[in-house]
Regions:
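Short, acidic, small-residue-rich periplasmic hinge/interaction motif at the N-terminus
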Residues: 20-60, 99, 540, 544
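Short acidic/polar hinge/loop motifs at secondary-structure boundaries
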Residues: 110-138, 157, 254
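Transmembrane beta-barrel wall of Gram-negative outer-membrane proteins
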Residues: 166, 173-204, 209-246, 297-308, ...
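Gram-negative outer-membrane beta-barrel transporters
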Residues: 436, 547-549, 569-671, 759
Length: 762
């Protein structure tokens, strides 16, 4: 048995002879950390398109931003931030695929929310400081646990427990009063069988966008028992956040004013607006915040049954609770179950109010894999089952000038619903060496989902005269086969190809925000990948062709719901196709360049958009307007994404200069439809302009225990946006004609900004 491994990055400065003897005695017992969770990862002869990011690479960019921004140099990745800083509410897309179609696991355990399918990185502040490495698979990838990988998957492995006692402090401070403080400590190996490790973090920022402040706290702790054949590890991590709303974006008429004399306001935030005071100054609700806490528990077992057979198993449990609070103007009191003041003078039909909407949820389950490896064959039998229980409810805590029901008391509940979901999957995957050069790969997965939503939603149903009634209970059975070949011509050249099928069930918003008489369908993806790899001493190159054919793809339609979540609709026939090129070269000793380029086309065939029509009184007509556009571009899917990274190292000094280019993106699927906004007479395309952003990072190590870092983001002060939304409708005119109306908002990112960092190791 081979016990060699890397066990951590921060070793206590004992004398070298003591450390060597201690390590030799302990390595036999702790080597198992390196063979955990291999069943859900791709390896060097798996015909899957993937990128590995190791601990050093993560640490080089981890000064406080969320994980989506740490992945920016990965091929085909776009990141966005509501606050414009990369901290707080952030998200990403891979190959144009939005985040709730990207499977994310931690140590093989599902992280995606069972109902929304998203991962809310704001609930996991500074999690990158507790990562050993991560793998990004593009396309369907290998079978994994949790929500289906429908364009990409990310597998994160938490930090190995170091051999020796240690302590670390890592602190950052910079623009927008952004700060990060991280404390880490570990016991080292105790009595040859035990070890413990912990982290505490605090992150704060005022945000680039007005009032878009964040206050984030988190911890990570783990303890393990191990011997030569067994590792039992308990991990817990938690995040608590308080974030001021910035999810509405900046309206286009403020960001792009039609009057040249009016200066654009890139930091404007409409959230929490309460009206103007007597002097005409806008007033904003101070507690327009999102408040949530989420805690994860993992208990994992790795048992070496014999030299060729290993068992991985884990139990997991996640507890989440929180709410967002917001000030809403001119709300119809009927929609909150409040007596609207009939018979009262003066009559009160609408009023400003403050509401809180809660999410109280539980998620738990187990995963396992039995991994066999011998000679030419690697085989994994694995799977898992989990159960989710989530309560959604809302309270009205204050009503302005309310003259209605005198029995009203603060925190009056106006809706409640429950979501329950079970998810079971089992997979069998194998990689077999037919010859010295040729490997064949097969992967079969069966997945069953049982989902139920019942109760009242937070949306008023005017036809029914009450809150939207929810009684939804779909059941899905999916079969996801995958297969491919990997051919190694020689040590420098390799070729691979694969075909994979994936299915994905609609999420909660797909059901609750669907149009009238519209029932969302499950999606099907057939993914074709063909890749070439070249590696030699001083340079490397790879090219990957992909064609992703969708049936009933749920594509972003440019609209958002009341809390800024992007909405989707099914399209029968669509595809994504492109080429991903990566290259790296050691130019001279100490100077390296790495880059990647994605060129793609992302199309919907025979696209028809259905648009709401309102009468002169603002009431929705029963039949929507159908606008046919033919073949169009899929929203938020640029044709070009390019990254470049120059790294210069001289003794203890390192400089990194990276560039990121993203081509034009459309806000919806109409392929660049132009609009006339009632507050902006210019016609403006429903799109996000291309942008080119450059960052410079400098670091210097004062020996092994002290380092300083400086990050200058957006070095050339590019004025750009990474996300946006559009809402459109028609108004029926007196003569029967239709008058279009559109609202658009964008999410600007910060101009040039700076973060300084110091790291101390003890």
């Amino acid at each position: 048995m081979n016990y060699k491994l890397l066990l951590g990055v921060a070793l206590f400065p004992f004398t070298s002879s003591f450390a060597e003897n201690f390590a030799e005695d302990s390595l036999k017992n702790v080597s198992l950390q390196e063979v955990e969770i291999v069943s859900v990862r791709a390896t060097n002869k798996t015909p899957v398109t993937y990128s590995n990011i190791n601990k050093e690479a993560i640490g080089s960019v981890n000064l406080g931003q969320d994980i989506p921004f740490l992945l920016l140099l990965t091929p085909s990745v776009i990141a966005t931030s509501d606050a414009g800083t990369g901290i707080g509410y952030t998200g990403f897309r891979i190959r144009g695929t939005d985040a709730n179609r990207i499977n994310v696991t931690v140590n093989g355990i599902p992280l995606n929310d069972s109902e929304s399918h998203g991962v809310f990185w704001v609930n996991m502040p500074d999690f990158a400081s507790s990562l050993e490495d991560l793998q990004v698979q593009r396309g369907v990838g290998t079978s994994t646990n949790g929500a289906g990988a429908f364009g990409a998957s990310i597998n994160m492995k938490t930090e190995n427990i170091p051999l020796l006692p240690y302590g670390e402090f890592n602190g950052s401070y910079g623009s927008f009063n952004t700060s990060k403080a991280t404390f880490k400590t570990g016991s080292g190996v105790i009595d040859k069988h035990w070890a413990f490790d912990a982290r505490l973090s605090s992150i704060g920022s005022g945000g680039f966008i007005d009032r878009a402040s964040v206050d984030l706290k988190s911890y990570f702790a783990q303890g393990a028992y191990f011997n030569e054949r067994t590792m039992l590890r308990f991990i817990t991590f938690s995040g608590k956040e308080k974030t001021y709303h910035a999810w509405d974006g900046v309206p286009d008429y403020i960001l792009f004013p039609s009057d040249p004399a009016v200066k654009a306001n890139r930091t404007y935030n409409p959230a929490g607006y309460m009206g103007d005071d007597a002097e005409g100054n806008p007033q904003y609700y101070p507690n327009q915040t999102d408040n949530y806490e989420q805690t994860h528990y993992q208990l994992s077992l790795l048992q070496v049954l014999n030299p060729n057979l290993k068992l991985n198993a884990a139990l997991h449990y996640t507890r989440g609770f929180g709410y967002y609070e917001e000030y809403k103007q001119d709300q119809n009191l009927d929609e909150y179950g409040l007596d609207n003041g009939k018979g009262v003078t003066p009559l009160v039909n609408t009023s400003d109010l403050v509401r809180q909407e809660y999410l109280d949820n539980y998620f738990g389950g187990m995963i396992f894999s039995l991994d066999y490896s011998r000679s030419k064959l690697n085989l994994s039998l694995g799977g898992g089952g989990n159960y989710y229980d989530g309560n959604h409810y809302g309270n009205v805590i204050w009503v302005k000038n309310y003259a209605g029901d005198p029995s009203f008391v603060p925190s009056q509940e106006y809706y409640r619903s429950k979501g329950k979901k079970s998810d079971i999957n089992i997979y069998l995957k194998g990689n077999y060496s037919l010859t010295k050069n040729l490997n064949i790969y097969g992967d079969l997965q069966v997945r069953r989902i049982d989902y139920a939503i019942r109760g009242k939603n937070d949306v008023w149903d005017w036809l029914a005269g009450g809150m939207q009634d929810l009684d939804i209970h779909p059941v899905f059975n999916f079969f996801n086969p995958k297969g491919g070949i990997y051919y190694q011509f020689n040590p420098e050249n390799a070729l691979y190809g694969s075909v994979a099928v994936a299915h994905r069930e609609p999420n909660r918003n797909n059901y609750t925000d669907a149009g009238t008489n519209e029932v969302p369908k499950p999606e099907r993806l057939t993914d074709y990948e063909l890749g070439y790899q070249f590696n030699c001493n001083n340079w490397a190159f790879s090219a990957n062709l992909y064609y992703m054919k969708y049936k009933d793809q749920l594509v972003l339609n440019g609209k958002i719901n009341a809390i800024g979540e992007a909405l989707t609709s099914n399209v029968p026939d669509s595809y994504r196709t492109g080429i991903e090129l990566t290259a790296g070269i050691r130019i001279i000793p100490g100077l390296e360049w790495n880059g990647n380029l994605t060129l793609s086309q992302n199309k919907i065939k025979n696209y028809t958009e259905y648009v709401a029509v309102y009468d002169s009184d603002g009431n929705a007509e029963p039949v929507q307007q159908a606008d046919y556009y033919g073949t169009t571009d899929i929203s938020f899917s640029p044709d070009v994404i390019a990254n470049s990274l120059f790294t210069f190292k001289y003794k203890s000094f390192t400089a990194r200069f990276n560039s990121n280019y993203v081509g034009k993106q459309y806000l919806d699927n109409t392929g660049g439809q132009t609009d006339i906004n009632e507050k902006d007479t210019r016609k403006k395309e429903r799109s996000i302009d291309a942008y080119f952003v450059n960052n410079l990072r400098l670091s210097y190590n004062f020996g092994k225990h002290v380092s300083v870092n400086l990050s200058i983001n957006n070095l050339f002060n590019e004025q750009y946006e990474t996300n946006g939304w559009v809402w459109s409708c028609y108004y029926r005119q007196a003569g029967g004609g239709l008058e279009p109306y559109t609202e658009k908002s964008y999410f600007p990112q910060a101009g040039i900004n700076v973060l300084a960092n110091v790291a101390l190791k003890f």
